[in-house]
């Protein structure tokens, strides 16, 4: 079974991320990373930075998560990310996403030993 840390990597890490400038990036990646199985995941963020840099966020600024938990951490610097948002008229199985390239700070929830990201909470 996939661990929480592995799921985070599958859903949110794309360190090569060279093709994120393509308008079809989200449609391809959401399918490839298995987030359009059974339903279309409405919103998802991919981070185009080395995994080690994202894992390092777990030792940066401690902030409260959206759900009230206290194990979220905010990156010191802005990271290259791509936001994928399901278009309003899109229906499963034809999941159609809007692709937006951004540079923002990210907030991730971390847990475990080693202490690693397990949930993408927000970008700010």
Swiss-Prot record:
Q: Which reaction does it catalyse?
A: an [RNA] containing cytidine + H2O = an [RNA]-3'-cytidine-3'-phosphate + a 5'-hydroxy-ribonucleotide-3'-[RNA]; an [RNA] containing uridine + H2O = an [RNA]-3'-uridine-3'-phosphate + a 5'-hydroxy-ribonucleotide-3'-[RNA]
List, from the UniProt record, the residues annotated as the active site of this protein: 12 (proton acceptor), 119 (proton donor)
Broad EC category:
lyase
Q: Which GO terms describe its molecular function?
A: lyase activity; nucleic acid binding; ribonuclease A activity
Binding residue positions for substrate: 7, 10, 41-45, 66, 85
The cellular location(s) given in this protein's UniProt record come to:
Secreted
Looking at the UniProt record for this protein, which Gene Ontology cellular component terms does it annotate, in alphabetical order?
extracellular region
Q: Which GO terms describe its biological process?
A: defense response to Gram-positive bacterium
- Entry annotated with the keyword Nucleotidyltransferase: no
Check the record and name the InterPro entries matching this protein: RNaseA, RNaseA-like_dom_sf, RNaseA_AS, RNaseA_domain
The region called Disordered is annotated at 1-25
The EC number on file is 4.6.1.18
Short name of one Pfam family for this protein? RnaseA
Alphabetized UniProt keyword annotations: Disulfide bond, Endonuclease, Hydrolase, Lyase, Nuclease, Secreted
**Comp. bias intervals (Basic and acidic residues):** 1-13
Q: What does this protein do?
A: Endonuclease that catalyzes the cleavage of RNA on the 3' side of pyrimidine nucleotides. Acts on single-stranded and double-stranded RNA.
Q: Which family does it belong to?
A: Belongs to the pancreatic ribonuclease family.
* Subunit annotation: Monomer. Interacts with and forms tight 1:1 complexes with RNH1. Dimerization of two such complexes may occur. Interaction with RNH1 inhibits this protein.
* Protein name per the record: Ribonuclease pancreatic
What is the organism of origin for this protein? Ondatra zibethicus (Muskrat)
Lineage, highest ranks first:
Eukaryota, Metazoa, Chordata, Craniata, Vertebrata
């Amino acid at each position: 079974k996939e661990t929480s840390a592995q799921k985070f990597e599958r859903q949110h890490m794309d360190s090569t991320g060279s093709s994120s400038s393509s308008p079809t990036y989200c449609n391809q990646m959401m399918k490839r990373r298995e987030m359009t199985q059974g339903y279309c995941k409405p919103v998802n963020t991919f981070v185009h930075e080395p995994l080690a840099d994202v894992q390092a966020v777990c030792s940066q600024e401690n902030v409260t998560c959206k759900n009230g938990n206290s194990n979220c951490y905010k990156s010191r610097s802005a990271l290259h990310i791509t936001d994928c948002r399901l278009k309003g008229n899109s229906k499963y199985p034809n999941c159609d996403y809007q692709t937006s390239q951004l540079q923002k700070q990210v907030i991730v929830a971390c847990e475990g030993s080693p202490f690693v990201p397990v949930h993408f909470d927000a970008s700010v």
